[in-house]
């Protein structure tokens, strides 16, 4: 199954900015690895939450469209809320 998500570059950093994103139904994330610099991004929570129930989400290459540019990544780490069915943060590694 091929996964493709739209993402935006995140400019606001820190705990307060991340909490505001989560309150608005978005997830803060980061893309790192390769020769490029790490990029902080924001993704839609519902799209990722629906996709992460598939086993292939964790092993297949995922395409992120970051401001019009496609980047191939794999899930490196995912943080979940302790008791709510919500995602808190995702780390992606360039494939």
UniProtKB/Swiss-Prot annotation:
CDD domains found in the cross-reference section: Ribosomal_L25_TL5_CTC
Protein name: Large ribosomal subunit protein bL25
NCBIfam families: PRK05943.1
Homology family: Belongs to the bacterial ribosomal protein bL25 family.
GO molecular function terms noted in the UniProt entry: 5S rRNA binding; structural constituent of ribosome
One Gene Ontology term from the biological process aspect of the record: translation
Keywords associated with the record: Ribonucleoprotein, Ribosomal protein, RNA-binding, rRNA-binding
Gene Ontology annotations for the cellular component aspect, listed alphabetically: cytosolic large ribosomal subunit
SUPFAM superfamilies in alphabetical order: Ribosomal protein L25-like (SSF50715)
Pfam family, any one: Ribosomal_L25p
Complexes and interactors: Part of the 50S ribosomal subunit; part of the 5S rRNA/L5/L18/L25 subcomplex. Contacts the 5S rRNA. Binds to the 5S rRNA independently of L5 and L18.
Cysteines engaged in disulfide bonds, as pairs: none
Protein's organism: Actinobacillus succinogenes (strain ATCC 55618 / DSM 22257 / CCUG 43843 / 130Z)
Physiological role: This is one of the proteins that binds to the 5S RNA in the ribosome where it forms part of the central protuberance.
InterPro entries recorded: Rbsml_bL25/Gln-tRNA_synth_N, Ribosomal_bL25/Gln-tRNA_synth, Ribosomal_bL25_short, Ribosomal_L25_dom, Ribosomal_uL5_bac-type
């Amino acid at each position: 199954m091929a996964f493709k998500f739209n993402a935006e570059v995140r400019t606001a950093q820190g705990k307060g900015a991340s909490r505001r994103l989560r309150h608005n139904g978005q997830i803060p994330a980061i893309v790192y690895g390769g020769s490029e610099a790490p990029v902080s991004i924001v993704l839609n929570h519902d799209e990722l939450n629906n996709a992460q129930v598939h086993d292939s989400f964790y092993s297949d290459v995922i395409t992120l469209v970051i401001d019009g540019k496609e980047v191939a990544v794999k899930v490196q780490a995912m943080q979940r809320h302790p008791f709510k069915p919500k995602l808190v943060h995702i780390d992606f590694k360039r494939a």
